[in-house]
């Protein structure tokens, strides 16, 4: 597939997602990075977003709960270019009923080439990067070209 680019803005739109057994770890990470995260737009699946807002006071755009379609809503925003970074603390030791949605979310984040953190160490690397609060160009699939080729 041909590629094009898009610019991630300096004020990022960050999706925050966590499985039940990882919510506390994500809350701790958000709390310890509140000053940096407050400068960006936060999105989250339902339960996670409400917990983050209650614990930190940071505004969060809440989707549905993950099992009710929230993971797919976040994935759709990624595909539309409306999410610039994903922090997803998923539980590698417990299966969840919506595992296919989780795989689809991670696949879309990879297809659309956005930064993804699956654990605290990676999230710390991303938030401490000089690129975190600056514009950054990324390569993405050229969907319009792909569509045009398929319609010929």
Curated annotation (Swiss-Prot):
Which positions bind substrate?
A: 19, 23, 45-48, 65-66, 98
Query: Which SMART domains does this UniProt record tie to the protein?
Result: MGS
Going by the UniProt record, its keywords in alphabetical order are: Lyase
Q: Signal peptide span per the entry? A: none
EC category name: lyase
Q: Which GO terms describe its molecular function?
A: methylglyoxal synthase activity
List each copy of the MGS-like domain by range: 6-152
A Pfam family reported for this protein in Swiss-Prot or TrEMBL? MGS
CDD domains the UniProt entry points to: MGS
Cystine pairs annotated here are none
- Which superkingdom is the protein from? Bacteria
Family matches, as InterPro entries: Methylgl_synth, Methylglyoxal_synth_AS, MGS-like_dom, MGS-like_dom_sf
Active-site annotation = 71 (proton donor/acceptor)
Q: Which Gene Ontology terms describe the biological processes this protein takes part in? A: methylglyoxal biosynthetic process
The reactions it catalyses are: dihydroxyacetone phosphate = methylglyoxal + phosphate
Q: Which GO terms describe its cellular component?
A: cytosol
**Documented EC number(s):** 4.2.3.3
What family does this chain come from, according to its entry? Belongs to the methylglyoxal synthase family.
State what this protein does.
Answer: Catalyzes the formation of methylglyoxal from dihydroxyacetone phosphate.
* Protein name stated in the entry: Methylglyoxal synthase
Question: Could you tell me which species this protein originates from?
Answer: Edwardsiella ictaluri (strain 93-146)
